[in-house]
A protein has these predicted regions:
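Active-site-adjacent beta-strand/loop module that shapes the phosphate/pyrophosphate-binding cleft
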Residues: 98
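Crotonase-fold acyl-CoA enzyme core
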Residues: 1-89, 123, 128-131
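Terminal low-complexity tails and localization/encapsulation signals of metabolic enzymes
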Residues: 131-145
């Protein structure tokens, strides 16, 4: 639950078994789950200690995608390659804006996003990416500058 993007195989099973053991989920289990899925689904999963299968995990937003077992690693590599192909400065700024924004009132979150947007305009990668976009060409490899 600590990952930014979660994918799984179609035979994956998820659950929070702790209450069946007489304890609460620890290490952020209750807090992360409630932020990923609705508080109601989080409570149902935690209170009942029941497992759910991959299609249900996808439906409630616990995972982003489900793949056949044989395709999972390829899908993960393709997703990682797409992220790696993006401008690192922009990816970091986007992650920061999303994570901080979730903890802020909307008006403050919009300001956080605007600052992240503005910070990207100071980079060589932004200039290269924008130039490629306007020329309708593929951007060159980003340099993290």
């Amino acid at each position: 639950m600590s990952c930014d993007i979660r994918i799984c195989a179609e035979n994956a099973v998820f659950g929070q078994p702790e209450v069946g053991l007489g304890i609460t989920p620890g290490f952020g289990g209750t807090q992360r789950l409630a932020r990923l899925v609705s508080p109601g689904y989080a409570k149902q999963l935690v209170y009942t200690a029941k497992n759910i299968k991959a299609p249900e995990a996808l439906r409630i937003g616990l995972v982003n995608a489900v793949y056949p077992q044989a395709e999972l690693m390829g899908a993960a590599k393709k997703l990682a390659a797409a992220i790696a192909d993006a401008a690192p400065i922009a990816v970091r700024a986007s992650k920061k804006a999303i994570n901080e924004g979730l903890e802020q009132p909307m008006d403050v979150a919009i300001e956080t996003e605007a600052k992240a947007f503005g910070s990207c305009f100071e980079s060589e990668d932004q200039r290269a990416g924008m130039k490629a976009f306007l020329s309708k060409e593929k951007h060159p490899p980003y340099q993290n500058r």
